[in-house]
């Protein structure tokens, strides 16, 4: 992602075409995610509801509020402010599951949080953006809800349904599903970087500073929040990473 984003920044036409397919690319990524979800993954609701509720609550409170505070503290322009808030109000990204695994965190909890924060996103994300971003730009609540349903909820549920109907076929291609989702997200992000290269230059270092602070605050506050409820290292690590890593692809699609 970093390498191709740099290429897109230096040579904008290389990936700028991808912006014409923003919703499609995100839909492909979400559909790929749905294909990897088994019904057993939903058992965490009944077997570990405490950790799941703690994680999802932290997800939809810490990052949105940190985004709002950063936008106010740095006196961001309306465009930048709503962009930061959009990212903050989105659910966790699937990359958090990989990072949690590498960090020796509770991968099952991370996957559960990603699934359920994604399923909650069509209802919670638009409301949060409406409440926190309304002071900068006019936000159409209904239009945003419909957008999230279209590019997130329907593709994910479609993927889950296909897996249940054709499990043997899906298992055969299971190893390449993450690659398909990654390619879609990389093209999506690279396209946005390429088409907004001039704006990124104009904004200067402030964008970099705000993004870094947003992620660091999310990780640290997520970890602290988990520790308040006496979650062990593995569970606290999963919560911290899930809170600190957002589904930026969804934010791009909604922007």
Q: Where in the sequence are the language-model features?
A:
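Alpha-helical transmembrane segments of multi-pass small-molecule/ion transporters
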Residues: 1-255
């Amino acid at each position: 992602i970093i390498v191709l984003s740099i290429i897109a920044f230096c040579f904008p036409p290389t990936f700028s075409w991808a912006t014409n397919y923003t919703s499609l690319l995100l839909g492909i990524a979400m559909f790929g995610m749905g294909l990897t979800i088994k019904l057993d993954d939903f058992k965490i609701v009944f077997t570990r509801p405490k950790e799941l509720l703690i994680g999802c609550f932290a997800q939809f409170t810490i990052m949105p509020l940190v985004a709002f505070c950063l936008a106010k503290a740095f006196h961001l322009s309306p465009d930048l402010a709503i962009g930061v808030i959009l990212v903050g109000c989105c659910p966790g990204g699937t990359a958090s599951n990989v990072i949690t695994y590498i960090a020796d965190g509770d991968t099952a909890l991370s996957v559960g949080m990603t699934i359920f924060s994604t399923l909650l996103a069509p209802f919670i994300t638009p409301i949060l953006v409406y409440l926190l971003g309304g002071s900068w730009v006019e936000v159409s609540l209904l239009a945003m809800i419909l957008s999230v349903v279209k590019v997130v909820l329907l593709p994910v549920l479609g993927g889950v349904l296909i897996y249940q109907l054709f499990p043997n076929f899906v298992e055969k291609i299971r190893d390449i599903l993450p690659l398909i989702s990654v390619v879609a997200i990389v093209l999506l992000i690279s396209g946005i970087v390429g088409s907004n290269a001039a704006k990124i230059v104009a904004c200067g270092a402030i964008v970099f500073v705000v993004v870094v602070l947003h992620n660091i605050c999310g990780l640290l506050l997520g970890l602290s929040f988990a520790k308040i409820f006496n979650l062990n290292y593995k569970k606290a690590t999963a919560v911290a990473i899930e809170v600190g890593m957002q589904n930026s692809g969804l934010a791009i699609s909604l922007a």
